[in-house]
């Protein structure tokens, strides 16, 4: 701080010095004799001035605060007087604008400088400006504070509005989320309800299906049970040895022997079709081949052989014991077959299900109610025992009838040969018939039905093949059992050819069908048929021991049977001719062996055998005849169908050829008609063109004639006009000559010689008049000569130029002029008016050909 007084520049100081004055250090407020009011702090003034205020605006009030400064030379603003103190601050603020023009520190500097005493400045002049500056600063601070408060209020209101909008948006979003969650929950509940309803419907449907399947199976089981029970009581009711019906059992069997195979076939077919076929063809099997536990148990029960079935298949037990002894004494060749039959019986579907009193795997459902139990249980035990125990079981009956054994051994070789031939023929015939039947069925049905029908045919043929053994064994007890008396001996019965080959033939047929039937079907049908054959062979196994009691002296026959049963499925059985020859037995064998044959024919075994063989032969011949007739009828039908088809094809071909011929004929006629039409149209076109050409030529000629005629008329009119003009000129020339002569005479006689000279025509005028007379006249539309400008007007000749109103210019003699006018009209006295002769020429028409 300087202790001395500060020197301030005078009024004439330059601007540079004045610019450096604010840079000097300020005196402290304590040293000032009259300190100004304390300035506003910097922090309160800084927000009032915006940062983009230019420095010129900030220093705008500096010239007013320095009254001692001179007027700035160039570019300086001249100092203006300060506004009066009583001005309203609002008007000052409005005039200054929204932004303040000066800051606090810059405004405070002049006040501090002006408060200091200076030798040149007047002290009284600085105090009002300082007060005004302080007052302005306070007003500015107040305005700035008000603006800040308003700004804060505006921001607070804006923030409140923004917060309110945010709250509204948040509430709306929450509401939308709740609505969406509610809709999703409703959809989930609806889906669960639908799923629950669907599951309930499916469960009810499954229960209904299960009840329906169970009811169907129960009905089939009940019906099968009723039929089996009825047939069981009717078949085996009198098989007990000590029953009173024993005496009539032989006659009953002999009476029903012929009709029995068909009866047994139908019963067993019904049984199989109503039990196993129902299960295999049920809708549950269509869904899955795996059966449930209760279904498999029912299938096992139905497929297990019953006592009645075993009794029927083992009806050879009713033969006399001597026959069985004969079969046992026939040699060791029968034992492999018996052992094989027993072995085939032993493994049943369920070996653990055995009767408490028998060792046979029979179904327990027939153990209680079957009347066959007392007699069939020991027989079945006898049939199922191993081959080593059989001699002990048959020993008691071996020594009872030595005569029968001896007579059996004495059987003639002719009968043995006949039996073998018949066996071979029967086997060949039936295998060939089975093959032909299958082929016919397969050929007669369409391809879409073959897989189903092949399976059904397989089932039917298998079911038919199974009861062959019981059907043949029912023929054996045709002769009653002989009494044990010593004197009653019977001749040996020749073995049944059908019974000996029943089991091998059935097996061969089953193998052939298993080989042929799966071929049109798919792999599923193959597996199905294999499983069916495996299940059907198990209950069919008891049928195989049927031919066991048939005797044969040599082991060749069992070996042949065993080889025939072991034929692989690939080997083809040779075909047989359509009408085979049958060897007949010698007629002397029967009377030589049967000397004591009764009249009824039912007690003699040989007679019964012969009758049975005869019936079989007749039936076979009848079957062959029917088959041959069927074949012939089929061939005839086939030929007729072929002929019908050929005739239809020929008729169709003829119709097609006729249709083609008609179409070709129609096409030719149509083409010819079109050609004729084209020719006719062409001819008409040519004729029309010729007619048009002729018409055009005729019109052209007419036009030419018309033009020639018009030209001729025009020439005639021209000639007449020329004649008229010539006459008119001649009369005018003569008249003018006379007048000229008279005028010259008058002029010569007159006192004035000048007028006579003037009136006399000159030589030039006379020459021109002569030339005009000699010139050729123009046509009617040409203009007249100069001497006669209006020669003819409506048939009147106008007066000459020197006459006016019919009188001469000098008007000496009027009667002469009248006479001339009359002479001028003379040429028209003989002809018509001129306008009447005027012909309007037609327009030229140019024709384009």
Swiss-Prot record:
Its main location: cytoplasm. Keywords: Coiled coil, Cytoplasm, Cytoskeleton, Isopeptide bond, Phosphoprotein, Ubl conjugation. One of its GO terms (biological process) is microtubule cytoskeleton organization. Belongs to the MAP7 family. The gene is Map7d1. Residues 568-582 have a biased composition (Low complexity). Residues 167-223, 602-724 form a coiled coil. Residues 24-41, 479-497, 542-556 have a biased composition (Pro residues). The modification Phosphothreonine is found at residues 49, 53, 99, 120, 554. Microtubule-stabilizing protein involved in the control of cell motility and neurite outgrowth. Facilitate microtubule stabilization through the maintenance of acetylated stable microtubules. Residues 132-151, 407-437, 523-539, 603-743 have a biased composition (Basic and acidic residues). This is MAP7 domain-containing protein 1. It comes from Rattus norvegicus (Rat). One of its GO terms (cellular component) is centrosome. There is a cross-link at residue 462 (Glycyl lysine isopeptide (Lys-Gly) (interchain with G-Cter in SUMO2)). It is found in: Cytoplasm, Cytoskeleton, Spindle; Cytoplasm, Cytoskeleton; Cytoplasm, Cytoskeleton, Microtubule organizing center, Centrosome; Midbody. The keyword Ligase does not apply. Pfam families: MAP7. The modification Phosphoserine is found at residues 72, 95, 115, 118, 125, 127, 256, 275, 315, 368, 401, 444, 448, 454, 460, 479, 496, 544, 548, 552. Residues 457-474 have a biased composition (Polar residues). Residues 1-151, 186-210, 318-815 are annotated as: Disordered.
